[in-house]
A protein has these predicted regions:
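N-terminal polybasic phosphate/anion-binding patch
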Residues: 2-78
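Anionic-ligand binding patches
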Residues: 52-192
Length: 192
């Protein structure tokens, strides 16, 4: 069943990022969820309204939502606006040990009549990276230092480095984009 937001004519997706990995993951997620549909996409640079390295679920989700909303404000004639925001979550470790740090991302898809949201899986960062993040560094630059690489957030990302590219950053985001599109795939159902 085709949804009210995804039709047969080419639909325009605005991704609230200029990061080629985020744009490619978004397009792939839409294409997988709606295989008979045509999409055009472009990225725009918009502020997230949250710190450069969001901490916790609420702040990260707010960053993704802010990005999607701001993309809609500057490109109002599109059909979909997508915000992707990576975040970290600190949790208490064993007494006397440093806090553990998880990495994850939120994806928000705004359409003309509904909004979808999904969170990626989470994974723990190694202490070498976690210490830099706890000290205020963004995850991407922290991983670049730990791994001796540059600009990994626009290639395989932290998840790709840690899994040996079994899961790269694009693949990591694609699944969450698909999950954020559930309300659009099921237009007769109600999602809050």
């Amino acid at each position: 069943m085709a949804s009210q937001d995804v039709q047969t004519a080419a639909r325009t997706i605005i991704v609230a990022s200029l990061n080629p990995v985020k744009i490619a993951a978004t397009v792939q997620g839409f294409s997988e969820m709606f295989p008979g549909s045509a999409f055009t996409s472009r990225g725009v640079s918009v502020p997230s309204g949250v710190p450069d390295q969001p901490l916790g679920d609420a702040e990260t989700l707010q960053g993704a939502l802010n990005r999607a909303q701001r993309a809609r404000e500057i490109e109002p004639d599109a059909d979909f606006w997508v915000g992707l925001e990576g975040g970290v979550l600190e949790e208490a470790g064993v007494a006397g040990s440093p806090k553990l740090v998880q990495s994850f991302a939120w994806i928000v898809v705004i359409g003309r009549s509904r909004t979808g949201k999904a969170r990626t899986a989470a994974y723990y960062l190694p202490e070498e990276t976690a210490k830099l993040v706890r000290d205020g560094m963004e995850l991407g630059p922290a991983e670049d230092i730990v791994w001796g690489k540059s600009n990994t957030k626009q290639t395989n990302g932290s998840v790709g480095l840690l899994t040996g590219d079994v899961i790269n950053r694009k693949g990591y985001y694609v699944q969450a984009v698909v999950l954020a599109l559930i309300p659009f795939k099921n237009p007769v159902l109600t999602f809050s």
